[in-house]
Amino acid sequence: MATKFPKFSQDLAQDPTTRRIWYGIATAHDFETHDGMTEENLYQKIFASHFGHIAIIFLWTSGTLFHVAWQGNFEQWIKDPLNIRPIAHAIWDPHFGEGAVNAFTQAGASNPVNIAYSGVYHWFYTIGMTTNQELYSGAVFLLVLASLFLFAGWLHLQPKFRPSLAWFKNAESRLNHHLAGLFGVSSLAWAGHLVHVAIPEARGQHVGWDNFLSTPPHPAGLMPFFTGNWGVYAADPDTAGHIFGTSEGAGTAILTFLGGFHPQTESLWLTDIAHHHLAIAVIFIIAGHMYRTNWGIGHSIKEILNAHKGPLTGAGHTNLYDTINNSLHFQLGLALASLGVITSLVAQHMYSLPSYAFIAQDHTTQAALYTHHQYIAGFLMVGAFAHGAIFFVRDYDPVANKDNVLARMLEHKEALISHLSWVSLFLGFHTLGLYVHNDVVVAFGTPEKQILIEPVFAQWIQATSGKALYGFDVLLSNPDSIASTTGAAWLPGWLDAINSGTNSLFLTIGPGDFLVHHAIALGLHTTALILIKGALDARGSKLMPDKKDFGYSFPCDGPGRGGTCDISAWDAFYLAMFWMLNTLGWLTFYWHWKHLGVWSGNVAQFNENSTYLMGWFRDYLWANSAQLINGYNPYGVNNLSVWAWMFLFGHLVWATGFMFLISWRGYWQELIETIVWAHERTPLANLVRWKDKPVALSIVQARLVGLAHFTVGYVLTYAAFLIASTAGKFG
């Protein structure tokens, strides 16, 4: 007899009910709880899975390169990137009627195609790719790499090639290698690629495998480098009249500090980007020699942490080294939090300081990339707190951490939680109060009675960075200050860029921005409150001091202790997910509506209508969904119909979530038993039999299913709205 799923848990495999399948899926990646798992084996399994993860990423990118080369219009797009829309891939659908075939035969294609809103065309072009052949070569190269990584993953699971536990616990060596190798050398390699391939291509000089060794990127060669005359590499940059991809107006500089944007592409100067990566390479290669390893030189993180006792912090950072180094959940929490912050920063910088040629003028792509990265940041941040809470339940040792900063966080958690609660209440009541007041007075025909607050502090900060519009005359916006004269010498293009009014750098802000900023602050603080409370109360609370004994997720502690439902760390994570999505809604609505005004040259629409609730509902959501709702109708379809369909489908998935979120165990148990009863009495259907006794989802499982539907539906609905409303206006 074959062993039943899951193989990793004999206990579950012998469960006679459908719980076996659900719990099997739920714990498949919870390696710590698997039968016979040792600490060493745990680390080895996770390590091997990283190779698989990287292989999947390479495979995915290879697929993008391949489909663009095979079915895209890359070579045509390069000739006119502002007017030709990039094609992602062809669509083959047997359900298409003639109307749909015609609607989706777009962007100069001879058959139905999808338009690319990912920005990959701009990226390929910027880094020096100009032909389909180069894209194919890249796709094959990544396929080979993916195979190599899959093999490496398999190899590191073989007994002879499994790293030891001591190797995994050697944090200093790992940090040195990751800092110097992963960040330092890869940044150096990227700077090298930009200097040797991308910059010459941008100046109309092709560099390929056939000539890259014989084509020096700078006429002076390496002589200035070895003689210390490095300024030569910054002399003679591209002129303002440079036509990207040609030698017209091109200079010879390779490492510059120009600031601002290339006038034609509206993206950062490639020579500035190369300089940036070279600087990062130098810093990180030095940083990668910082920590003490086998040679006894450099810093010991353990010694630093144990010695570091700041004022009012008790035992300070004592024993934190071992606490972190012995807890994978702590490490994962830190990694997710860092990556979450970086991903959000990427979203903010991709539109304000676009680095890829012509991407700033592809408005739909800009909107899609901003929203995409902010959503990913939201999921990563919630995951960080989830694993922080699991750390407190599974890995935290109160004795080892006595009176250090971690223990003190737990000891004064009431102060933290109550302050966050106060901030959230303050923000919520005041922001909603202002919106509601404004909404009422506008509804009664007296818009002049709105309470409109100018964000003077934020405007002052913009002025310090050089925005002259507000007349603050401070630092960079004061032409006579030291900051301005220094800036003119070191970043000559910056002030032009910040004051141009046609890009997204330091957008002009007013009362509408002030209100929505505080709405977003409310969302962020409430999400943080729920997550921080969930993590700090994960071991126990006044209501349930022994909570840690019940694990990370439990529905309730039975009828004898009333009030213990919904207080596990899992429940906090579950609730925070809704707040996280809610916050992202406000954030992306704001960004999108603000930019629709900037792009269409009509900023007044946002400024006048974003100060009251009906303005948001009517002038952002309703007005921009008109084209979407008309994607298909009795008279035919247009090329937005796929988004219209996705918009409807997203709503359906989202609404399905509530069926699981609002009804619980009893309903499902009755429903399942009724369905089983009907099956067993229906001809043909009764030939199919369950081997497991069907039981309803547990409360936690039903919440997970509901949350998954809510989340997927929410994302699908807004993605369709965002892309269709922007593409409908700007193509």
UniProtKB/Swiss-Prot annotation:
Record-level Gene Ontology MF annotations: 4 iron, 4 sulfur cluster binding; chlorophyll binding; electron transfer activity; magnesium ion binding; oxidoreductase activity
Subcellular localization(s) per the UniProt record: Cellular thylakoid membrane
NCBIfam families for the chain: psaB (TIGR01336)
Complex formation: The PsaA/B heterodimer binds the P700 chlorophyll special pair and subsequent electron acceptors. PSI consists of a core antenna complex that captures photons, and an electron transfer chain that converts photonic excitation into a charge separation. The cyanobacterial PSI reaction center is composed of one copy each of PsaA,B,C,D,E,F,I,J,K,L,M and X, and forms trimeric complexes.
Transmembrane portions of the chain: 46-69, 135-158, 175-199, 273-291, 328-351, 367-393, 415-437, 514-532, 572-593, 640-662, 704-724
Gene Ontology CC terms: photosystem I; plasma membrane; plasma membrane-derived thylakoid membrane
Residue sites binding chlorophyll a B1 per the record: H651
Effect caused by changing C565S: Accumulates some protein and PSI, still does not grow photoautotrophically
Mutagenesis or variant effect for C565 to D/H: Almost no protein accumulates. No PSI activity is present, unable to grow photoautotrophically
InterPro entries noted in UniProt: PSI_PsaA/B (IPR001280), PSI_PsaA/B_CS (IPR020586), PSI_PsaA/B_sf (IPR036408), PSI_PsaB (IPR006244)
Gene Ontology biological process terms, A to Z: photosynthesis
Family from the record: Belongs to the PsaA/PsaB family.
Lineage start: Bacteria, Bacillati, Cyanobacteriota, Cyanophyceae, Synechococcales
Keywords for this protein: 4Fe-4S, Chlorophyll, Chromophore, Electron transport, Iron, Iron-sulfur, Magnesium, Membrane, Metal-binding, Oxidoreductase, Photosynthesis, Photosystem I, Thylakoid, Transmembrane, Transmembrane helix, Transport
Catalytic activity annotation: reduced [plastocyanin] + hnu + oxidized [2Fe-2S]-[ferredoxin] = oxidized [plastocyanin] + reduced [2Fe-2S]-[ferredoxin]
Function, in words: PsaA and PsaB bind P700, the primary electron donor of photosystem I (PSI), as well as the electron acceptors A0, A1 and FX. PSI is a plastocyanin/cytochrome c6-ferredoxin oxidoreductase, converting photonic excitation into a charge separation, which transfers an electron from the donor P700 chlorophyll pair to the spectroscopically characterized acceptors A0, A1, FX, FA and FB in turn. Oxidized P700 is reduced on the lumenal side of the thylakoid membrane by plastocyanin or cytochrome c6.
Topology in the lipid bilayer: Multi-pass membrane protein
Annotated [4Fe-4S] cluster binding sites: C556, C565
Residues binding chlorophyll a B3, per UniProt: M659, Y667
Co-factor note (free text): PSI electron transfer chain: 5 chlorophyll a, 1 chlorophyll a', 2 phylloquinones and 3 4Fe-4S clusters. PSI core antenna: 90 chlorophyll a, 22 carotenoids, 3 phospholipids and 1 galactolipid. P700 is a chlorophyll a/chlorophyll a' dimer, A0 is one or more chlorophyll a, A1 is one or both phylloquinones and FX is a shared 4Fe-4S iron-sulfur center.
Protein's recorded name: Photosystem I P700 chlorophyll a apoprotein A2
